[in-house]
């Protein structure tokens, strides 16, 4: 492992605490850890001095405008297709995420294989928690995709500035 940064430590602790809270919903320590981590990540303390990418949130908000889904539901449904789309543009960060958060062993693997294994670990974890895994579960239809893409606020500064066609591609993979 490289030295863990604050965001990686938060993710690792969130994984541990959420698994504990799912097994024991009244575990105060696990639930308070989840809230503490959310506070630190949402107030962007862990992002200071780094380039951040909030585009997945913009896509999620646009999906929410077309459905009754909460923001968390939209994020769980679109995150993996979004990250897989971005993987070539942020390969080293995704590789680091795989190794430092999911303990993926990179030996004998390409950077792409290591990064994808990390996303596969994330996918298994999300399924383990029972999260929404696609936007169809939220009531999204093919006919809604152009409107959702039109309603997505495109931000600068992430791994890739998305085009309308990029957003449509991500949404289709999220179905």
Regions found by a protein language model. Give the residues of each.
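C-terminal catalytic subdomain
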Residues: 51-117, 123
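Generic structural concept
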Residues: 15, 35-38, 60, 80, ...
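Single conserved hydrophobic/aromatic residue that forms the stacking wall/gate
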Residues: 1-6, 10-11
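Oxyanion-binding "anion nests"
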Residues: 14-52, 59
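Short amphipathic alpha-helical interaction patches enriched in hydrophobic/aromatic residues
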Residues: 18-22, 42-46, 63, 67, ...
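Short, solvent-exposed positions on alpha-helices
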Residues: 28-32, 73, 133, 143
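Non-catalytic, well-ordered alpha-helical scaffold segments
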Residues: 8, 32, 73-80, 168
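C-terminal charged capping/lid subdomain of soluble metabolic enzymes
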Residues: 101, 105-175
């Amino acid at each position: 492992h490289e030295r863990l940064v604050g965001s990686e430590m938060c993710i690792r602790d969130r994984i541990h605490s959420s698994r504990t809270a799912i097994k024991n919903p009244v575990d105060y320590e696990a639930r308070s850890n989840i809230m503490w981590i959310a506070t630190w990540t949402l107030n962007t303390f862990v992002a200071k001095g780094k380039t951040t990418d909030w585009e997945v949130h913009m896509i999620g908000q646009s999906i929410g405008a077309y459905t009754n889904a909460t923001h968390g539901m939209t994020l769980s449904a679109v995150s993996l297709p979004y990250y897989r789309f971005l993987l070539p543009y942020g390969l080293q960060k995704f590789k680091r995420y795989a190794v430092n958060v999911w303990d993926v062993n990179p030996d004998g693997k390409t950077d792409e294989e290591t990064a994808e294994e990390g996303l596969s670990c994330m996918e298994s974890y999300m399924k383990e928690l029972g999260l929404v895994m696609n936007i169809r579960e939220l009531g999204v239809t093919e006919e809604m995709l152009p409107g959702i893409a039109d309603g997505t606020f495109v931000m600068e500064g992430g791994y890739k500035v998305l085009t309308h066609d990029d957003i449509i591609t991500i949404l289709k993979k999220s179905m």
